[in-house]
């Protein structure tokens, strides 16, 4: 089966073709093209919805052409079209949804609507150490239940995955997502956009003295880390950074970046591990754009390996953490029984929930 995946939920235009050749679940990514809009949004320090939609409209056809050329295929070869319908920015979503519907109608192909959050989870479930170009996986019932942390610029959610297609959100951000907090702090520090990679890079340059804690001269709050629920809140952390910077005579940017990053990591890991214990999870998934953060991945792996109970840790390759068409295609395969040729049923939903 050849699946075309289309992703336009935010500011990345992603189109991919994934081959699922047998019932055992062996996947091969034939092509995975991503057109970034960083240059468009960098002057604003964040994504501007109307500009994002404009760039999607400009980029989507060239992306499709590149995807087909790299895979050496034609649209007539495609068996299923999968497209993100939400959650996300409605102007962006509409570009991808309408484009996918037009292709499905023209080439008489079945189409399936995909939840963006579920696709991030699918990317972790279907990934392996082989990486992006050619990898295999086998989804086993022994993986479940799963606790999935999906964390990006627009989302921070803890999801209980009871089985494929059975999801329950047990916690989410009440204000800023973790990735959004990175972006806003980076703007305060004039590090540019996107903020996550910039802060991560600067943080590696901080070297605390032997007699100092990691935080060095100051320590930022860990918002809601001890709350009994699994919700998150990162707007207060950004505010704490603002006031700390005002009080500092000399700003040590690497030190601030290291502390901001560690504060976010501490909260994300603490909540996830507590949820895994309560729900007796057999697997923990880390997914979404922020999952590409090397320090977050390292500390997650370390803390999970130190647990008394054996829990499998799954995280996609870094190039599958960002928004991409491959994860949409893989989610499409896992949900192929829901595909339709009634194209009017496929509608964008900016506030779509996974449960």
Which sequence ranges carry the predicted segments?
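Conserved phosphate-binding/catalytic loops in two-lobed NTP-binding clefts
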Residues: 113-114, 284, 310-328
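Glycine-rich phosphate-binding loop plus the immediately following alpha-helix
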Residues: 162-204, 239, 243-249
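Short beta-strand scaffold segments in enzyme catalytic cores
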Residues: 13-19, 148, 156-160
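Conserved phosphate-binding catalytic cores of ATP/NTP-utilizing and phosphoryl-transfer enzymes
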Residues: 114-146, 331
């Amino acid at each position: 089966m050849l699946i075309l995946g289309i992703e336009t939920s935010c500011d990345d235009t992603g189109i991919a073709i994934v081959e699922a050749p047998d019932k055992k679940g062996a996947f091969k990514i034939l092509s995975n093209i991503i057109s970034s809009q960083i240059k468009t949004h960098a002057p604003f320090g964040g994504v501007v919805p109307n500009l994002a939609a404009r760039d999607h409209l400009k980029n989507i056809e060239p992306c499709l052409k590149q995807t087909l050329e790299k895979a050496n295929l034609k649209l007539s070869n495609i068996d299923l079209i999968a497209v993100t319908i939400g959650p996300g920015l409605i102007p962006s979503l509409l570009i991808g949804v309408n484009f996918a519907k037009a292709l499905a109608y023209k080439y008489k192909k079945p189409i399936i609507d995909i939840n963006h959050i579920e696709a991030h989870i699918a990317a972790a479930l279907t990934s392996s150490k082989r990486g992006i170009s050619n990898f295999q996986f086998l989804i086993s019932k022994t993986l479940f239940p799963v606790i999935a942390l999906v964390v990006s610029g627009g989302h921070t959610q803890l999801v209980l995955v009871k089985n494929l297609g059975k999801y329950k959100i047990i916690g989410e951000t009440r204000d800023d997502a973790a990735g959004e907090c990175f972006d806003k702090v980076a703007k305060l520090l004039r590090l540019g956009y996107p903020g996550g990679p910039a802060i991560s890079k600067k943080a590696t340059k901080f070297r605390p003295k032997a007699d100092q804690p990691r935080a060095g001269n100051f320590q930022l709050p860990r918002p809601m880390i001890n709350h009994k629920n699994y919700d998150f809140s990162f707007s207060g952390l950004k505010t704490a950074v603002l006031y700390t910077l005002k009080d500092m005579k000399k700003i040590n940017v690497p030190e601030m970046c290291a502390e901001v990053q560690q504060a976010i990591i501490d909260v994300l890991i603490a909540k996830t591990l507590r949820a895994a214990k309560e729900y007796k999870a057999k697997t923990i998934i880390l997914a979404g754009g922020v999952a590409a953060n090397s320090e977050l991945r390292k500390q997650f792996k370390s803390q999970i390996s130190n647990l008394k109970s054996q829990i499998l840790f799954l995280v996609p390759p870094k190039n599958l953490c960002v928004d991409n068409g491959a994860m949409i295609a893989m989610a499409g395969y896992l949900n192929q029984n829901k595909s339709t040729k009634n194209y009017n049923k496929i509608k964008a939903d900016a506030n779509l929930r996974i449960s």
